[in-house]
Every structure is written in C-alpha cells, then in structure tokens.
Amino acid sequence: MKNNTLQPGKGNIFTRHPMMTVFVFTFVCLFPVMLTRDFTPSNELRYLSIANEALADGHIFAFYNHGLAYADKPPLYFWIVMLCRLLFGHHSCLALSMFSLIPAFVITGIMDKWVMKGKSAMDRMALAGMTLTCVMFLGTMIVLRMDMLMCMFIVLALWTFYRMYSGDGARRSDSVMLPVWIFLALFTKGPVGLLMPPLSIAVFLTVKRDWKGFGKYLGLKTWGIIAGLAALWIGCVWIEGGPEYINNLLVKQTVGRAVNAFTHAKPFWFYLVAIIWCLAPYSLLLAGTFVASLLPVRNTCVEETSGQAQSKVGISDTSDASNCPKQGRSYLEILFLCTIISTVAMLSSFSSKLPIYLVPVFPFCVYLFPIVLDRIGERGWMRWGVGIFSIIFTVIGLAALPVLFGAVKIPALNDLLTEYPFALEAPIINGIILLTLANILGIWFLLKRKVWNIPALLLGAGLFLAVFSASAVVKDINPYIGYGSICSKVPEGTDVATVFLHRPENIDAYIGRQITDYGKEPERLVEAVSASDKPLTIITRTSRLETIPELQKLFSNGTVLYSGPYCLTTISKK
C-alpha cells in the first residue's frame, strides 16, 4: 500500500494529534446546529415532557407521559434530561446534544486505539471521519436519543472482552467492567444493549471453538453481576411503579416489541437494505470490504497455531500488506465479522425495526476496512468505492447550483422552493459549493495519487462544512422541525387545542400547560368551541386551514398567526 502521509509523531500539530483534530473540527461544524435547532415532536419533545412530569411528581425509576406509564426506555437517559433541566433551568438542546456527540467521539477514539496502532495520521483521520459521517451515525450524533450512548457502552464491552481474550492491554478490572458495560448498555436503551455484546462474544468463541471461553467470559461472574444490577433496578421500579409498571416494562415493551411489534413492524430483510443507505457515502467501500473479508483466505504467509498462544492482537501485529498481501484472518477481523453478522441477524429476527437500531454495528463496519486492507493490500475498488460517491456529490452540486442561482428553471422544483424559501439563501448555496469543491479536490487526489484516504477525508470534511454553512439558516428551518416557533406565539392564560398535528400532546414542554388534541376531527373542535366560555388558542396546519370549511369559520373569528407550515388563532369569548 502506498503511504504518502506523515507517520505518527512527525509533522505539524494536526498529524501529531489526528483524532483531536477530527473531534475539534467536528464539534466546531456541528455546534451551531446543536445550539439553534428546535426539538422534534416525535421523540425529543416527548422525552422533555416525560422528564418534566418526573421532576414534578418526584419519580426516578418509573416514568409517565401525561399520566400513562412510559416503560419503553430505561431510566439513564431520562436522568440525563432531568439533570440538564435542573442545572440550566430549561431544556437545552446544546447540553443534551453533548450526550450524543461525546459518546460518538468516545466510540471513534476507542476504535482508533483498538485498530489503528502504528497507522499514519492521514489513515486515522480518514477512518475517524468516515465513522462520524456515515449518514445514520451523523444523524444520531445530532438528534437527542439514547442510541449513541448505548453504542458507546457496547463498544466498551467488546473492547474490554478483546483485551481479556488477547491479553493486549488487559487490566485486572476487565472481568468486572465487562458485565458493567453490558448492564449500562441495557440501562441506557434496553434489550439490544444486553444481547449484542454477549451474542457477539458467543459467536466469536464458537467460531474459534474456544469452549472454555464461555465460562471465562460469559460465566457465572459476568451474568451474576448483570443479574445483580438488573435486580436492583427492577426492585426500585417495583417499589415506585408497582406490578403493573413491571409488566409493561418486561412483557409489553420487551417481549411485545421483539415478537409481535405494535410499532415499527418491518419484514425480515429490512436491515439488509437499510444498512446500505445508512452507511452512505461509504456504502460501496464498506460493502466491498465485508465481501472481501468473507472470501476464502488463500496462500496464507504465516501458519496460525492453535490455542491462546497465538498472537491475537489484530492488525497492529500483522506484517505489512506489501510483503504479505494474503495473510490469514486475524482474531480481530473474525470478532468484527461475528459482531456485524450476529447483530444484523438478531435485529432482523425482531419484529420492531428502525434503521437507527443499526447504529451499534457501524463502527465495526467502518473499522473492518483497515483490517482487511492490511490483509489483502490496497485495491482499485477501494479507491473507487469512495470516488464514486465523490463523483455523485460533485455532479449533484454542479447541477444544483444553476437551479439555486435561478439560471435554470425546473417547474417541478418551483413549488418546493416556494414552500421552503430558505433553500435559496446564501448559507445553503455556500454549503453546496464547499461540498462540491471538497469532492472535486478528492477526485483529483484519487486520480493523481491513487490513494483512498485523502478523498475519504475530503468527502467527510465537505459534509461537515456543508452542515456548518447551512446551520446559519437553522432558525428559518426550525418551524419545519418542531413546534417551538408556533408555540412561542401562544398567548398566556388561554386553553390550547390542536387539530391535524403530528404528536402534539407534548407541546406542554413549551407552553407549560396541557393541551387538548382533536386529532383529525375538526367537527369535535367546533362543538368544544361552542360549549366553552374560555379563550381558546387553536393550532393547526396551514394546508388544512386552506381546505377545511369548519376550520376556516373558526379562524375567521380571530387574528391568524403563521409559522412555517403551522398557524394559530385565539378565539376570545365576549
């Protein structure tokens, strides 16, 4: 493999501290978005409302959403939301975002330390950038969910296991920390956190036919610690929520979602398709890596010896690919393959499926690449696995700019640009220009130097720069993200009703009082208005107001205020 980059310890501050460089750059690019964006109604606003209710009622282990038991998630993330609320006096999107961003940095840092020992600064930065800009991983860094935190604990668990198994960097505390990390993954998100690390370890030990390892790594000590911590948690839930809440937690939410999901039910093959676009823009490279890793190994240079005496420390102990282009699979490569395959198979067997559930496998998908690269050497398809997406982004960028500048008119896009005028603002255009230029430069390096790392690094950097530039119009986008903007127009002291809104029940997190939602039944709203003698604020979608006579009649009684796709009016009874 050609190496035109500086080695660790040489060069400037960026090459001496490649991971810190990537993390600081990522933080700077994402900071404005995290600081200014609104909360989404589906999950984020619900978490805030649940936290408010828990603080008001003094609940710590059993949570409720408007009086109804909410046993969908364990308490750790709600504790974080509650703590931030107490510390800042309000719900801070920036503060809560840190509990997605920092775990992402920890995950990437661990994978780099685990896999990239002795590698060039450019390779390390490229792999870190790839991890952080896989589309679903990047999205999970920005949204307020517990998935990234759970992923961090899963990575910590598997890293701890591998240290114990290989003896490389093993610590006396590892036998205790392995079950602790597994429990914390469970305590963050639920059953996937409990199942993924032991399943990956079990499949790996089975492949290696290390039957004694089951007792050593997944024996009574491991399960005893997990069971003890889980019993303590369940006991606290029982005391606070009672048997009905326990049944909801253990039966409905756990077994129900796995066997016969009441939400997010998808076919078995769903993840086989979803993982391709979730790993974009590195899908081709990583899919090719996975296939190359599965292909039979031929002409191994070094005979592997049986038993634990064999070196098991992964790519840092293998010979240079140029000297030995077809070595046998390292234990680390086998572990990563077992983790990816077993996790996707496990998730596919569950009835409830969402693309974001795949997040824990993404670090292993990305860092499988340098392991395979060391074993088989750099190939042309690896460079073009990155280059094809660079070309796609370049073509899209060059095609979009004339449209956004108004030089080219496309009738099909006129309505969209009219509905979303912020798409024509300078920060959006600048972001597209930055992304396009970065990929043009990446293509040049691909053709001129025939390397994969610089184009990959530029592709990721271009995405971050585009997000940074576009963040200047987040305040204009916020009305389309959440309800904060329209709720800021709600007057004090009125009752609030909603109709034709998606998940409006948690608007109380903004206005400090409960609302009445009339779903898709404006006739019930009309009856309620007629029967009430109190001032009433009505919130709905502007598109519905324009087409439904009942709403038009109600809104004609007051001043109509607009924000993004929503509008409201206040009806005062005289």
Which ranges hold each PLM region?
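Membrane-integral, polyisoprenol-dependent glycosyltransferases
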Residues: 2-382, 476, 558, 563-566
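Membrane-embedded architecture of ER/inner-membrane glycosylation machinery
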Residues: 2-5, 176, 292-303, 317, ...
